[in-house]
C-alpha cells in the first residue's frame, strides 16, 4: 500500500494538532468543577464520564497524522492509569503543555535532542522532590479523603473504600461489583475463600441451605487423587479418636473413597466433607501450600516422601471455622502467624518479580487470602448509565487509594506541581547547554498548567492565582470548590504522590518522543469505488433504437 510521508515541521505540527484535540477533550474534566463528557455508544445509552482515561480511550481522529499524535497522548493517560489508577487528566495536560512549548523552541531552530535532555533532567529532579515531599497516610480519615477526591469529591464512596481497606488491610483484596439494588454496600469474606464446593450434597450439616459448617476442624491437604478408601483409613481412624470434624482437600476424590465418606457422614459416624483442590496446574500446588501455611498443616506430597498411609495427626491443618456450600469453601485460620508472614513476604517478592499482569493479579489474590480476606463493594444506582459511571469512579478511587497507601500523599489541586516548579527555580543550571536550559525552563512553565486548568474549569483566570500562590506560605493552595485559600493537607485536598509523580514522568516521556520526531508515515487511504453494480459493460453500438 502507498504511504503518505510528512517531514520536519509538517510532521510535528500535524502530530501536535492531534495531541491538542485529545487534550482539549480530556482537560475539561479536571478538578472539582470539571465538566462531564458525553460519549456516544453504537448500542444502548451514551456514557457520561468525568474520567480522563475513559474520554481518551474513545478518541480516534479522521486525519491519520493527527490520529498518531492523539494515540501517543492516549498512551500517557492509559500508562498513568495502569501504574497509579488516577492522574490521567493531569498527565494529559502536562504532556500537551511540554510538547507545545517544546515545539515552539524546535520551530525556532533549537536542537530537539538538547531540549529533551533538559526536560529529562528537570523531570528527574521534580520526581525526586515529589517523593521527598510525600506524607505517609495511616488513618482511616486520610484514606477516605484520598478516595473521595479520586471519586470526584464523592465522600460516600470515599468512606466506603476507607471502611473496606480498614477491614481487610492494605494487602487485602477489594473488588468492585454491580449491586442488584440502588444502594452501595460492602460485604466481607474473612479468612481464605476459594471457588470449590463439596463433592456431594450428602456432606451438608445444614439441610435448609445445603451447607457444611465445622468448628475446630482438622484439614487433610493432599496433592493427588484419592480413589481407594484403604488409603484414607489410617487418617480417618486417627481423626475419629479426637472427635473433631475433617475437611479433605485433594485433586479429586472418587470411587469407593467418596462413597465411604458419604456413608460415614450420613450415618453420623464421622463429621467429614471432601472438596477438590482450588486452582489449576502450578497454581494449584501453590494454593495448597498456602492453605497448609494458613492452617498450620503440611501438604501431603510424594515429592516430600509423604503418603496418606503415614500421615500423623500433627501434619493435618486446623481451622477455627470451615464453611462449605455447593460453590465455595471458606477457611478461617488458626495458623502460625510467623509462618503466614514469611509466606506473605515470599508472595510479595513474586509479585515484584512478575512481568505478567495476569500473574500479578492472581498472586495478589493469594496474598489477600493469606493476610486479610476479601471485601466486595457492591455499587448501586438508579439507572444503568449512572451505575456504569459510578462503578468506574469507585474503581479509580480504589486504585488511587492503593497508590496513596504505597507512596504517601502530597497537597492536591496542582499546588504540589507549583511548589516543585519553585524548587526547580533554585537549581543551578549554569553547567547545562543552551538547549538543555530551554528544556529545563519548559518543564518549569508546564508544571503550572494543571492548576491553571483546574481554576479555569471553576470559572476564574488561572494566571492571577498562580502568581499569588507563589507568594503564599508553603502548603497553602486554592480550593476550587469553595473558592478559598486553604491549607491543602488540613482541608483534605490531597493527591497520592505516586499519581502526581507518574503523571509528570509519563507526560515528559511522550512529549520527548513528539519533540524528537522528524518524519511521520501513514497509509494513503484508498478511494472507495462509488460506481454502480458489477454487471457487464454495455456495447456502445447497442444504444436505444
UniProtKB/Swiss-Prot annotation:
Does Transmembrane show up as a keyword for this record?
no
Q: Tell me the organism.
A: Borreliella afzelii (strain PKo) (Borrelia afzelii)
Query: Which Enzyme Commission number(s) are on file for it?
Result: 5.6.1.7
Chain's role: Together with its co-chaperonin GroES, plays an essential role in assisting protein folding. The GroEL-GroES system forms a nano-cage that allows encapsulation of the non-native substrate proteins and provides a physical environment optimized to promote and accelerate protein folding.
Q: Please give the HAMAP family that the UniProt record associates with this protein.
A: CH60
Membership in a protein family: Belongs to the chaperonin (HSP60) family.
The gene name reads groEL
Mention one GO biological process in which this protein takes part, according to its record: protein refolding
What protein name applies here? Chaperonin GroEL
Catalysed transformations (reactions): ATP + H2O + a folded polypeptide = ADP + phosphate + an unfolded polypeptide
The protein's assembly and partners: Forms a cylinder of 14 subunits composed of two heptameric rings stacked back-to-back. Interacts with the co-chaperonin GroES.
Q: Looking at its record, which EC class is this enzyme?
A: isomerase
Q: Which InterPro entries match?
A: Chaperonin_Cpn60_CS (IPR018370), Cpn60/GroEL (IPR001844), Cpn60/GroEL/TCP-1 (IPR002423), GroEL-like_apical_dom_sf (IPR027409), GROEL-like_equatorial_sf (IPR027413), TCP-1-like_intermed_sf (IPR027410)
Location comes to: Cytoplasm
Any one GO MF annotation of this record: unfolded protein binding
Record keywords, A-Z: ATP-binding, Chaperone, Cytoplasm, Isomerase, Nucleotide-binding, Stress response
Q: Looking at the UniProt record for this protein, which Gene Ontology cellular component terms does it annotate, in alphabetical order?
A: cytoplasm
Q: Which domain of life is it from?
A: Bacteria
> Which PANTHER family does the record associate with it?
60 KDA HEAT SHOCK PROTEIN, MITOCHONDRIAL
Amino acid at each position: 500500500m502507498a504511504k503518505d510521508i510528512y517531514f520536519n515541521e509538517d510532521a510535528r505540527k500535524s502530530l501536535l494538532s492531534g495531541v491538542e484535540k485529545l487534550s482539549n477533550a480530556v482537560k475539561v474534566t479536571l478538578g472539582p468543577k470539571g465538566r462531564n463528557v458525553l460519549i456516544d455508544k453504537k448500542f444502548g445509552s451514551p456514557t457520561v464520564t468525568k474520567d480522563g482515561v475513559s474520554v481518551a480511550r474513545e478518541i480516534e481522529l479522521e486525519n491519520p497524522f493527527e490520529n498518531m499524535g492523539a494515540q501517543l497522548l492516549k498512551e500517557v493517560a492509559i500508562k498513568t492509569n495502569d501504574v497509579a489508577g488516577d492522574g490521567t487528566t493531569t498527565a494529559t495536560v502536562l504532556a500537551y503543555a511540554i510538547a507545545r512549548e517544546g515545539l515552539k523552541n524546535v520551530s525556532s531552530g533549537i536542537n530537539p535532542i538538547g531540549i529533551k535532555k533538559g526536560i529529562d533532567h528537570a523531570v528527574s529532579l521534580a520526581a525526586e522532590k515529589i517523593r521527598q515531599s510525600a506524607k505517609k497516610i495511616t488513618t482511616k480519615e486520610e484514606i477516605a479523603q484520598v478516595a473521595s477526591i479520586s471519586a470526584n469529591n464523592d465522600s460516600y464512596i470515599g468512606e466506603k473504600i476507607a471502611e473496606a481497606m480498614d477491614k481487610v488491610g492494605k494487602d487485602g483484596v477489594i473488588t468492585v461489583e454491580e449491586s442488584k439494588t440502588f444502594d452501595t454496600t460492602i460485604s466481607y469474606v474473612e479468612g481464605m475463600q476459594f471457588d470449590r464446593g463439596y463433592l456431594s450434597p450428602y456432606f451438608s450439616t445444614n439441610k435448609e441451605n445445603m451447607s457444611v459448617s465445622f468448628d475446630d476442624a482438622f484439614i487433610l491437604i493432599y496433592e493427588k487423587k484419592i480413589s481407594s478408601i484403604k488409603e484414607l483409613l489410617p487418617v480417618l481412624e486417627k481423626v475419629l479418636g479426637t472427635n473433631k470434624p475433617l475437611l479433605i482437600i485433594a485433586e479429586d476424590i472418587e470411587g469407593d473413597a467418596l462413597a465411604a465418606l458419604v456413608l460415614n457422614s450420613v450415618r453420623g459416624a464421622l463429621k467429614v466433607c471432601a472438596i477438590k483442590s482450588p486452582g489449576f496446574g502450578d497454581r494449584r500446588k501453590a494454593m495448597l501450600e498456602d492453605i497448609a501455611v494458613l492452617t498450620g498443616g503440611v501438604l501431603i506430597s510424594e515429592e516430600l516422601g509423604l503418603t496418606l498411609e503415614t500421615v500423623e495427626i500433627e501434619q493435618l491443618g486446623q481451622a477455627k471455622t470451615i464453611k462449605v456450600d455447593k460453590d465455595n469453601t471458606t477457611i478461617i485460620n488458626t495458623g502460625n502467624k510467623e509462618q503466614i508472614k514469611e509466606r506473605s513476604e515470599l508472595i510479595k517478592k513474586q509479585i515484584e518479580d512478575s512481568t505478567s499482569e495476569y500473574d500479578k493479579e492472581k498472586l495478589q489474590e493469594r496474598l489477600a487470602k493469606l493476610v486479610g480476606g476479601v471485601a466486595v463493594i457492591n455499587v448501586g444506582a438508579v439507572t444503568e448509565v449512572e451505575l456504569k459511571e459510578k462503578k468506574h469512579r469507585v474503581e479509580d478511587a480504589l486504585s488511587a487509594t492503593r497508590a496513596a497507601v504505597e507512596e504517601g500523599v502530597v497537597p492536591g489541586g496542582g499546588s504540589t506541581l507549583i511548589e516543585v516548579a519553585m524548587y526547580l527555580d533554585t537549581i543551578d543550571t549554569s553547567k547545562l547547554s543552551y538547549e538543555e536550559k530551554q528544556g529545563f525552563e519548559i518543564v518549569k512553565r508546564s508544571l503550572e498548567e494543571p492548576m491553571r486548568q483546574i481554576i479555569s474549569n471553576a470559572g476564574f483566570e488561572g494566571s492571577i492565582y498562580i502568581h499569588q500562590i507563589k507568594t503564599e506560605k508553603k502548603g497553602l493552595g486554592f480550593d476550587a470548590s469553595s473558592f478559598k485559600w486553604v491549607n491543602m493537607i488540613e482541608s483534605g485536598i490531597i493527591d497520592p504522590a505516586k499519581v502526581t509523580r507518574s503523571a509528570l514522568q509519563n507526560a515528559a516521556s511522550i512529549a520527548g518522543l513528539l519533540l524528537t520526531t522528524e518524519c511521520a508515515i501513514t497509509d494513503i487511504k484508498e478511494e472507495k469505488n462509488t460506481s454502480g453494480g458489477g454487471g457487464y459493460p454495455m456495447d456502445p453500438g447497442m444504444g436505444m433504437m
